[in-house]
């Protein structure tokens, strides 16, 4: 009986409260006679429009912030290392010729314009609103394909923390269950609005010492987590899956980088990561877009170019330091790759 009375009382209360909310306008002074209308049928379309606008605002916020940072740094054309965030910001007002460089594990957001990037066997074109994710250290060829003074090519490069990715991986649902049909270590996708928002917050947090120390690391963790569950999660999960070709080749590339001046013995390197010579060569090319020997040669030449522009060592000393036994061979291969002799390159400004 008591329970029945209690239930009756609750139902009565709910009915009264509902009635009050339904008639709420008449309790307000000078309230309009018009009642609240039922949600129209086009509300779903309206919500989609609002969502698109919100995503567009996030993109514009990030572009405006990066542009302001470049302006403050006085960089009208070129690259800028933003020390507080650890990122690199880029702006170009004209298209560029092909340029050889090294990509390390990174996220690159194209905010305006477009660029082309690739290896000797693969080429990708990525434009505004898209991102590149690079899982391995790679020698690449790139060029800016869309840029003008009115709409300059603008991008940001966010370096990836592989240790942080590995710590997050166990909590992430796997999107792969075996080797991928395309293990290439550069992935391309549309930029996720949530990722743009996190990057914008990261930049803002890096402006003040207190938020840079307390909040920015948390947001950096969020950015890495979003990459593991986003559109290009496969690129990074392949790297973190220890039985994948990407993971094994990562070990091989790391060995080559650490022993750059030493001669590569393919059989020894293949055995080090548990592959036959033929499987190693095939998987290495699939992941990096080049052969082991060409990979080492490209890294040697790029390292030599940096050394020439940042030190006063003789050309022959630079050549021997990166593993060349012949200064003449070094000069020939250097000129073939960069279109300039080592001595000519020494006169140029350091590359950012």
What is the predicted role of each segment?
Residues 222, 226-232, 239-241, 257-259, ...:
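Basic/polar phosphate-binding segments, predominantly the helix-turn-helix DNA-binding elements
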Residues 31-83, 96-97, 179-183, 205:
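A short, N-terminal "cap"/entry segment at the start of jelly-roll beta-barrel domains
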Residues 10-25, 37:
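N-terminal amphipathic/hydrophobic targeting modules at extreme N-termini
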Residues 255-259, 306-310:
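Short alpha-helical segment immediately N-terminal to, or the first helix within
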Residues 23, 79-177:
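N-terminal regulatory/effector-sensing and dimerization cores
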Residues 2, 23, 27-30:
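Intrinsic-disorder-associated, low-complexity terminal segments enriched in Asp/Asn/His/Tyr and depleted
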Residues 48-61, 165-222, 226, 252-254:
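Amphipathic alpha-helical segments enriched in hydrophobic/aromatic residues interleaved with Lys/Arg
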């Amino acid at each position: 009986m008591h329970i029945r009375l209690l239930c009756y009382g609750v139902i009565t209360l709910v009915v009264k409260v509902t009635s009050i909310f339904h008639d709420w306008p008449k309790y307000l002074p000078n309230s309009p006679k018009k009642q609240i209308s039922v949600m129209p049928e086009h509300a779903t379309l309206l919500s989609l429009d609002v969502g698109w606008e919100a995503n567009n605002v996030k993109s514009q916020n990030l572009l405006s912030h990066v542009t302001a940072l470049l302006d403050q740094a006085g960089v009208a054309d070129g690259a800028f290392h933003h020390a507080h965030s650890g990122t690199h910001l880029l702006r170009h007002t004209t298209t560029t010729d092909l340029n050889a460089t090294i990509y390390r594990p990174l996220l690159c957001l194209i905010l305006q314009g477009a660029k082309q990037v690739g290896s000797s066997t693969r080429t990708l074109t990525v434009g505004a609103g898209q991102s590149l994710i690079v899982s391995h250290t790679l020698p690449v060829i790139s060029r800016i394909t869309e840029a003008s003074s009115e709409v300059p090519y603008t991008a940001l490069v966010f370096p990836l923390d592989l240790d942080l990715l590995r710590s997050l991986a166990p909590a992430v649902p796997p999107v792969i269950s075996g080797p991928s049909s395309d293990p290439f270590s550069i992935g391309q996708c549309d930029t996720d609005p949530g990722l743009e928002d996190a990057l914008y917050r990261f930049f803002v947090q890096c402006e003040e010492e207190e938020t840079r120390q307390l909040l920015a690391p948390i947001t950096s963790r969020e950015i890495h987590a979003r990459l593991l569950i986003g559109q290009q999660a496969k690129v990074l999960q392949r790297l973190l899956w220890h039985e994948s070709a990407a993971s094994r080749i990562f070990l091989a590339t790391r060995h080559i980088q650490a022993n750059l001046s030493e001669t590569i013995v393919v059989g020894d390197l293949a055995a080090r990561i548990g592959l036959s010579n033929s499987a190693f060569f095939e998987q290495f090319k699939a992941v990096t877009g080049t052969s082991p020997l060409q990979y080492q040669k490209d890294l040697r030449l790029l390292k030599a170019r940096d050394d020439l522009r940042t030190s006063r060592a003789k050309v022959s000393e630079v050549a021997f330091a990166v593993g060349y036994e012949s200064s003449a061979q070094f000069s020939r291969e250097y000129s073939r790759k960069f279109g300039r002799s080592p001595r000519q390159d020494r006169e140029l400004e350091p590359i950012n």
